[in-house]
């Protein structure tokens, strides 16, 4: 099964946007872009972690975020799910999606999260 990602908040700019990632590699993929106090791989279920999204290639910082972790099978999709709460500019949302795709996610199709 593939790991998917999508913006969960309505289209457009807002104060906060939520990007959801689901699948067997979700935690590894988000952890590869996240720098916080501890690795997301070591984090427990139903926890929230503050940190920065950093592009591994050149250490570019995109945003300060909160990442919520919901581990399988007790999540909305039954798989590992992470919700990334980032600032809501379209640039940040689209760049984050591109970074996730570059790291191994596929863009979710309409209805895949529901």
Regions found by a protein language model. Give the residues of each.
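A glycine-rich (often HGG/GG-containing) alpha/beta subdomain
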Residues: 1-114
């Amino acid at each position: 099964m593939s790991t998917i990602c999508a913006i969960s908040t309505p289209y457009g700019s807002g104060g906060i946007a939520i990007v959801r990632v689901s699948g067997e590699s979700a935690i590894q993929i988000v952890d590869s872009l996240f720098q916080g106090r501890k690795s997301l791989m070591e984090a427990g279920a139903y926890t929230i972690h503050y940190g920065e999204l950093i592009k591994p290639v050149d250490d570019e910082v995109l945003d300060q975020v909160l990442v919520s972790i919901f581990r399988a099978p007790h999540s909305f999709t039954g798989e590992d799910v992470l919700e990334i709460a980032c600032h809501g500019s379209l640039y940040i949302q689209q760049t984050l999606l591109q970074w996730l795709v570059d790291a191994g996610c596929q863009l979710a199709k309409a209805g895949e999260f529901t």
